[in-house]
Amino acid sequence: MPTVNQLVRKGRSSAAKKYKAPALHYSFNSLRNKVAFGDGSPQKRGVCTQVKTTTPKKPNSALRKIARVRLSNHMEVTAYIPGEGHNLQEHSVVLIRGGRVPDLPGVRYHIIRGTLDTAGVANRQQGRSRYGAKKGKAAPAKKK
């Protein structure tokens, strides 16, 4: 614990805030060729450099689809591809948002379905906005 004299001389310093999705807080200045830390953006655009599957941590078992994405701020991150089936491949342009996948270490971002080169999930009826699925045709009413 500091003494009164130390507090008078130096004061208290606040701890640096740690961000859960740091890549969204950096922006690239093409004129100065520098990356700057800023207020952040809700989404970022990027290009897939690798699309693959990986296995989750201990109690779970699956083949989770992930993509390595090079963002517009020149950072490279690993993002999760939600939903069943996808059309992503190398050089696909995608939009990412923050949000980790608890059982995949190092995956802190999600790819937004239904935007840019990412197709929405086919035949999805519930929670469609999360997966970029269009409203399906309503079933015709039965006649008596």
From Swiss-Prot:
Pfam families per the UniProt record, alphabetical: Ribosom_S12_S23
InterPro entries noted in UniProt: NA-bd_OB-fold, Ribosomal_uS12, Ribosomal_uS12_bac
The keyword Ribonucleoprotein appears for this protein: yes
Molecular functions (GO terms): rRNA binding; structural constituent of ribosome; tRNA binding
GO cellular component assignments: small ribosomal subunit
Key words of the record: Methylation, Ribonucleoprotein, Ribosomal protein, RNA-binding, rRNA-binding, tRNA-binding
3-methylthioaspartic acid, modified sites: 103
Ranges of biased composition (kind: Basic residues): 131-144
GO process terms (BP): translation
Family annotation (CDD domains): Ribosomal_S12
tRNA-binding in keyword set: yes
Region of interest: Disordered: 125-144
PROSITE patterns linked to this entry: RIBOSOMAL_S12
The organism's place on the tree of life at top rank: Bacteria
Subunit structure: Part of the 30S ribosomal subunit. Contacts proteins S8 and S17. May interact with IF1 in the 30S initiation complex.
Family under the similarity heading: Belongs to the universal ribosomal protein uS12 family.
Free-text function comment from the UniProt entry: With S4 and S5 plays an important role in translational accuracy.
HAMAP family named in the record: Ribosomal_uS12_B (MF_00403_B)
Record-given protein name: Small ribosomal subunit protein uS12
Gene (UniProt): rpsL
